[in-house]
Amino acid sequence: MTVLHVQEIRDMTPAEREAELDDLKTELLNARAVQAAGGAPENPGRIKELRKAIARIKTIQGEEGDLQENE
């Protein structure tokens, strides 16, 4: 999985953004589980990259009004 750039995220539909967000959250959860278990992650910088990508998607969702009120 590559880094998501802002323009790529803006070009996605709201449903695609939501699906990508779910995928990134799952990947982050797995990476943190490996780290918590004491294992060496394949790419140590990946956790930071995932967090930033999630933040970018959420920011754009907020700007474009995609966010639901309960989030």
UniProtKB/Swiss-Prot annotation:
Keywords: Ribonucleoprotein, Ribosomal protein, RNA-binding, rRNA-binding. The keyword Cytoplasm does not apply. The keyword Phosphoprotein does not apply. GO terms for molecular function: rRNA binding; structural constituent of ribosome. SUPFAM superfamilies: Ribosomal protein L29 (L29p). GO terms for cellular component: cytosolic large ribosomal subunit. Pfam families: Ribosomal_L29. One of its GO terms (biological process) is translation. Part of the 50S ribosomal subunit. Interacts with protein L23. Stabilizes the tertiary rRNA structure within the 23S rRNA domain (domain I) to which it binds. Located at the polypeptide exit tunnel on the outside of the subunit. Belongs to the universal ribosomal protein uL29 family. This is Large ribosomal subunit protein uL29. It comes from Haloarcula marismortui (strain ATCC 43049 / DSM 3752 / JCM 8966 / VKM B-1809) (Halobacterium marismortui). The lineage of its organism: Archaea, Methanobacteriati, Methanobacteriota, Stenosarchaea group, Halobacteria.
